Swiss-Prot record:
Name of the protein described by the UniProt record: Histidinol-phosphate aminotransferase
Organism lineage: Archaea, Methanobacteriati, Methanobacteriota, Stenosarchaea group, Halobacteria
Keyword Transferase appears in the UniProt entry: yes
Modified residues (N6-(pyridoxal phosphate)lysine): 222
Highest rank taxon of the organism: Archaea
Region annotation (Disordered) ranges: 1-21
GO MF annotations, alphabetized: histidinol-phosphate transaminase activity; pyridoxal phosphate binding
Keyword terms, alphabetized: Amino-acid biosynthesis, Aminotransferase, Histidine biosynthesis, Pyridoxal phosphate, Transferase
Gene that this polypeptide is encoded by: hisC
Protein family according to the UniProt entry: Belongs to the class-II pyridoxal-phosphate-dependent aminotransferase family. Histidinol-phosphate aminotransferase subfamily.
Organism in which the protein naturally occurs: Haloquadratum walsbyi (strain DSM 16790 / HBSQ001)
Pathway(s) per entry: Amino-acid biosynthesis; L-histidine biosynthesis; L-histidine from 5-phospho-alpha-D-ribose 1-diphosphate: step 7/9
């Protein structure tokens, strides 16, 4: 007995956790700064923590009312009807829901390269195929509707990540509008706004009242600090919102996650503090790191360092965990998440020193001189 052929499916590889790295280095986890997974360094709202505790004694019952209450609150926040909110276990779950609703065998999904690895995974799970459009370093990762439309070939689903991961670049509302008007009426444009709270641009959610070929993804994992609870949603046009009842997983958004998210929405001061910190940190990285960086609308910065793996490994040895972006096709770069002000300042000092050390070691090795880090 064997499953179907899964050879085309690449497994999702998450960033390593602090405890895992601490065991490897044989150090106290509290001595490490994790800046590799774009998490909220301030954690969840205290109100969300209280809601989690309050829910503990009732997890023996299904989350029907919690699900309904959160859906209604999100809808009210955006000025939509509750039917237009597809609650899901993280934004990943919403990606799968849209694949279930729109993909039939042989359909194609158009996604950015580089981009989030779960888009192609979801397409293949649902017997679809993938085509890509470039978001290239040579063009400073700029996203333009005209460039996307050049690669467009009547795909059923078209994903745009704004702010883009790992570059942080954005596609403004006028460009999204141009995209919506430039594709076939049977193509759904999915705007992934996982990092939308950190952006200075308005959300594309306002467009779904005008265009029935746009859906928008949002998550509570980032600015709301609830990554461990896996709660997100898609905002969809009213004309086909009723499809949710036919494709969603029953009670997929658990009660604890729903109650925590409901409390987190009400504590906007915590969200605003988290956003303010991230915006300060990303500018601090760009101003203080002695390496090329790009403007970012997210809670992270992409940094060109020459040898991303070597820099990430050396930074880890010094207690700062960052993301080597080789898996994104950018082996010369690292992605650095925004920490607290204290964490960010410490990270800048360590990463700057590490970049210099790696560059020196590489230059020395290439010149044929024996060093501690390598031989000719």
């Amino acid at each position: 007995m064997q499953p179907r052929d899964l050879s085309a499916h690449e497994p999702y590889v998450p960033g390593r956790g602090t405890k895992e790295v601490a065991r490897e280095l044989e150090v106290d986890p509290d001595s490490l700064i994790k800046l590799s997974s774009n998490e909220n360094p301030h954690g969840p709202s205290p109100a969300a923590v209280d809601a989690i505790a309050d829910t503990a004694e009732t997890v023996n019952t299904y989350p029907k009312s919690s699900h309904t209450d959160l859906t209604a609150r999100i809808a009210d926040y955006w000025g939509l009807s509750p039917e237009q909110i597809w609650l899901s276990p993280g934004a990943d779950g919403a990606i799968d829901y849209l694949s279930r609703a729109f993909l039939t065998p042989g359909d194609t999904m158009l996604i950015s390269d580089p981009g989030f690895s779960y888009y192609p995974m979801s397409a293949r799970y649902h017997h679809g195929s993938i085509r890509t459009y470039p978001v290239s370093k040579e063009q400073d990762f700029q996203q333009r509707a005209s460039d996307i439309l050049t690669q467009y070939d009547d795909e059923r689903l078209l994903y745009v990540t704004t702010p883009h991961n790992p570059s942080g670049s954005e596609l403004p509302i006028p460009e999204i509008t141009a995209l919506a008007e430039g594709v076939d009426d049977q193509t759904l444009i999915v705007i992934d706004e996982a990092y939308g709270e950190y952006s200075n641009n308005p959300s594309a959610i306002k467009l779904i009242q005008e265009y029935d070929n746009i859906a928008v993804l949002r998550t509570f994992s980032k600015a709301y600090g609830l990554a461990g609870l896996r709660i997100g949603y898609a905002a969809v046009p009213e004309s086909w919102a009723d499809a949710y009842a036919r494709i969603n997983t029953p009670f997929a958004a658990n009660k604890t996650a729903c109650q925590a998210a409901l409390a987190a929405i009400e504590d906007q001061s915590h969200v605003e503090h988290s956003i303010e910190t991230a915006r300060w940190a990303r500018e601090h990285y760009r101003e203080e790191l002695d390496a090329r960086t790009w403007p970012s609308g997210g809670n992270f910065v992409l940094c060109e360092v020459g040898d991303g793996n070597a820099v990430a490994e050396a930074a880890k040895q010094e207690g700062v965990i960052i993301r080597d972006t080789t898996s994104f096709g950018l082996p010369e770069c690292v992605r650095i998440s925004c920490g607290t002000r204290e964490q960010t300042k410490r990270a800048v000092d360590i990463i700057s020193a590490v970049i210099e050390d790696v560059e020196t070691a590489t230059t020395t090795t290439e010149s044929g001189v024996e060093t501690e880090v390598g031989r000719p």
